[in-house]
Amino acid sequence: MIIKNLQEFYRLLIPNAPLIAIDYGSKKLGIALSNQERSIAMPLNTITEINKKIVITSLLNIIEKYKVCGVIIGLPIDMSGAVTEQTNIVMKFAEELAKSINLPIYLQDERLTTKAANNLLKSFGVKRKDRNNNDDAVAASMILETVLDSIKNI
């Protein structure tokens, strides 16, 4: 189920279970995982498959393996806050994922996270090819970190 309110999302979470975040792109998905205490967000991996059934199966495997209790999906909106074509694509993906899992899904504003992730990797001296392979997972960890920071105050 897609939850629009962060407090409601938090209320539905199981104590001491991790969250995952997804940075959904047209060519790849970045995945990040929190620790059980939800104090740290870590890039997990990048899914390069574009077939939605395979992507959802991969996500279900991650959810089962790490005993995840909630999912955060980065919602790409433009700088003015307007909905874009990519926003609609991500919302449709979130709806499809919600049909496959019985976990709360929260959509988090992800403006500029992939660019920030790429800049962060660049500042560490990561080569362009490696940045492009990892920036979505790092962006997902930034999205997750934003939510983790917000729920500390709930």
From Swiss-Prot:
One of its GO terms (cellular component) is cytosol. It comes from Rickettsia peacockii (strain Rustic). It is found in: Cytoplasm. One of its GO terms (biological process) is rRNA 5'-end processing. Pfam families: RuvX (PF03652). Gene3D superfamilies: YqgF/RNase H-like domain (3.30.420.140). This is Putative pre-16S rRNA nuclease. Its EC number is 3.1.-.-. Keywords: Cytoplasm, Hydrolase, Nuclease, Ribosome biogenesis. Belongs to the YqgF nuclease family. Its main location: cytoplasm. CDD domains: YqgF (cd16964). Could be a nuclease involved in processing of the 5'-end of pre-16S rRNA. GO terms for molecular function: nuclease activity.
